[in-house]
From Swiss-Prot:
Gene: Dnttip1
Comp. bias (Gly residues): 12-22
Subunit organization: Monomer and homodimer. A minor proportion may form homotrimers. Interacts with ZNF541. Interacts with the terminal deoxynucleotidyltransferase DNTT. Interacts with TRERF1. Identified in a histone deacetylase complex that contains DNTTIP1, HDAC1 and MIDEAS; this complex assembles into a tetramer that contains four copies of each protein chain. Component of a histone deacetylase complex containing DNTTIP1, ZNF541, HDAC1 and HDAC2. Identified in a complex with KCTD19, HDAC1, HDAC2 and ZNF541.
Motif (Nuclear localization signal): 163-169
Region span, Important for dimerization: 56-147
Source organism: Mus musculus (Mouse)
Name of the protein: Deoxynucleotidyltransferase terminal-interacting protein 1
Start-end of Basic and acidic residues biased regions: 142-158
Keyword Cell membrane among record annotations: no
Location of region: Important for DNA and nucleosome binding: 196-315
Domain topic, free-text comment: The N-terminal domain mediates dimerization. The C-terminal domain mediates interaction with DNA and nucleosomes. It contains a HTH motif that mediates recognition of the consensus sequence.
Length: 328
């Protein structure tokens, strides 16, 4: 009636007449502020369109897809931070790889060892997010709940499909690695347990008159001098004792070996090496150099440690420990 702020304009079905003017609240000077209702209608329609687009982007019902979309956005930043962590510890991997190459030989690819060590770190890091029920399969193979986006990437890198878990298959199938899935037969042989039993694994055979040799000299005596440590790979059933710092100090004092610092030093039983040299595998071998075997005896305190070590490694004791009832 008399107040300007109470003035109303007739509205159509859309809330205002197209092209008409609407009087808003009075300004500071008491003058009405004119508002174009058509602009209000346009703004309202834009809000509605934003609402529809928002509904479309959140219409996914598969939680794995939604989480993988978020992971894909964050992955570059995550990779950058992970790379920074590996750069922090890379000097340790590099020193270890170079040490392995010095011990084994120049044919060792140090860079490949570093890459494999980094991949193993990532595999073990998966345990940080395990559900506590399926820890063993995650140790040896891919996570059961692997994201769909990563499946295509890993299949393209491996060149073989990811084996799917099916009902009725034995647990050993789940634990098989990529080489076994690719059909490599030799992997099954490497999975056979090493038998540590019989007279050669009887701790009673070790005494103060037993003669021992360094693993490096045994390696040369059997014609494997070019590759250090090959004897342990070819004959894993042999008893070998890793000398601790106290043992290495005594061996160096007696001039049986040079001070090796942090390098490993293994002791083997001389009788075992000579039995190998007389076996069919080495009979008639021109590379045998048994004169390299510089045998020696050990003090009683070191022999006692070796007895206990052999006792713990015996296959019979492993079976007893597995069959023993749990302590309550």
């Amino acid at each position: 009636m008399g107040a300007t702020g109470d003035t109303e304009q007739p509205r159509g079905p859309g809330g205002a007449e197209r092209g008409g003017l609407e009087l808003g609240d009075a300004g500071a000077a008491g003058q009405p502020v004119l508002t174009n209702p058509w602009n209000i209608m346009i703004k309202h329609r834009q809000v509605q369109r934003r609402g529809r687009r928002s509904q479309m982007t959140t219409s996914f019902t598969d939680p794995a897809i939604s989480m993988d979309l978020l992971r894909a956005v964050l992955q570059p930043s995550i990779n950058e931070e992970i790379q920074g962590v590996f750069n922090k510890y890379m000097k340790f991997f590099q020193k270890a790889a170079l040490n392995v190459r010095d011990n084994v030989g120049e044919e060792v690819d140090a860079e490949q060892l570093i890459q494999e060590a980094c991949r193993s770190c990532l595999e073990q890091a998966k345990l940080l997010f395990s559900d506590g029920e399926k820890v063993i399969p995650r140790l040896a193979h891919e996570l059961p709940g692997i994201k769909r986006g990563r499946q295509a990437e890993e299949e393209s890198h491996r060149g073989s499909p990811i084996p799917k878990k099916r009902k009725g298959r034995p647990p050993g199938h789940v634990l098989s690695n990529d080489r076994a899935a690719a059909g490599m037969v030799w992997k099954q042989k490497s999975c056979e347990p090493i038998r540590r039993e019989g007279p050669k694994w009887d701790p009673a055979r070790l005494n103060e008159s037993t003669t021992f040799v360094l693993g490096s000299r045994a390696n040369k005596a059997l014609g494997m001098g070019g590759t250090r440590g090959r004897i342990y790979i070819k004959h894993p059933h042999l008893f070998k004792y890793a000398a601790d710092p106290q043992d290495k100090h005594w061996l160096a004092e007696q001039h049986h070996m040079r001070a090796t610092g942090g390098k490993m030093a293994y002791l083997l039983i001389e009788e075992d090496i000579r039995d190998l040299a007389a076996s069919d595998d080495y009979r008639g071998c021109l590379d045998l150099k048994l004169e390299e075997l510089k045998s020696f005896v050990l003090p009683s305190w070191m022999v006692e440690k070796m007895r206990k070590y052999m006792e713990t490694l015996r296959t019979e004791n492993e079976h007893r420990a597995a069959e023993a009832p749990p302590q309550t």
